[in-house]
């Protein structure tokens, strides 16, 4: 009974923290949007600055949309059982290729190259295809976001001991050692990333970790001399 009570208390604490974090994250863009909109309407913002103000409103609206989308992703994760039982076989190389295509605009927009090292033939793994697609998207989006402009993102898939290892490597700022263990915490944003990523809300890597945990898989990260590498596992079919 005491164990159950402690577990329920922990869940309630996490729920309260989640609600507080959501309220804070939503309030920031809404306050900005409201402030600039009211400034335009009441004349506080002069006509010559209205366009700049509208651009800020549009930017914050998009950020709010991204935030809501992340919250929905998180809500979907919270609804998952601890073990995902409805796993199926799918081609990991095809999944990675499709995600790269969807991020092509962002990658080329930052003048990045992509070096893909994957088997030519289909590589079948076990998992939930939609969830693994989300994992690949979040990691590749993260790499594109923090890679130094004009550098190369390396995507490599290898096989060993019944597992497929997918590594995503980018060149950029080194993540401090004391931050590495916190990267996968919900709503955590490393100090080094705050100035580089004003749009993120600290959920992307948490979602990755949660999905892989539900699949009973693993993810590791290293960051040395400007090279950051994320590697996650999936079970070969």
What is the meaning of each model-derived region?
Residues 59-65:
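Short alpha-helical segment of the dimerization/phosphotransfer core of two-component systems
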Residues 216-217:
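Conserved glycine-rich
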Residues 79-85, 124-127:
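Conserved micro-motifs of the catalytic ATP-binding
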């Amino acid at each position: 009974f005491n164990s159950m009570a402690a577990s329920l208390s922990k869940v309630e604490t996490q729920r309260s923290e989640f609600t507080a974090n959501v309220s804070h994250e939503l309030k920031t863009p809404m306050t900005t949007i409201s402030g600039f909109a009211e400034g335009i309407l009441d004349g506080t913002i002069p006509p010559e600055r209205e366009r700049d103000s509208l651009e800020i409103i549009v930017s914050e609206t998009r950020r709010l949309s991204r935030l809501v989308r992340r919250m929905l992703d998180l809500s979907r994760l919270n609804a998952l059982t601890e073990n995902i039982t409805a796993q199926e076989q799918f081609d990991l190389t095809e999944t990675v290729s499709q995600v790269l295509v969807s991020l092509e605009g962002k990658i080329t927009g930052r003048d990045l190259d992509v070096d893909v090292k994957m088997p030519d033939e289909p590589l079948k793994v076990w998992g939930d295809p939609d969830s693994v697609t989300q994992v690949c998207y979040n990691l590749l989006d993260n790499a594109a976001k923090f890679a130094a402009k004009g550098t190369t993102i390396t995507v490599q898939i290898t096989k060993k001991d019944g597992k497929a290892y997918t590594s995503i490597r980018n060149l950029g700022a080194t993540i401090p050692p004391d931050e590495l263990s916190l990267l996968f915490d919900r709503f955590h944003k490393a100090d080094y990333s705050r100035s580089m990523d004003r749009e993120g809300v600290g959920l992307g890597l948490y979602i990755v970790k949660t999905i892989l945990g539900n699949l009973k898989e693993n993810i590791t990260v290293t960051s040395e001399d400007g090279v950051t590498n994320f590697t996650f596992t999936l079970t070969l079919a």
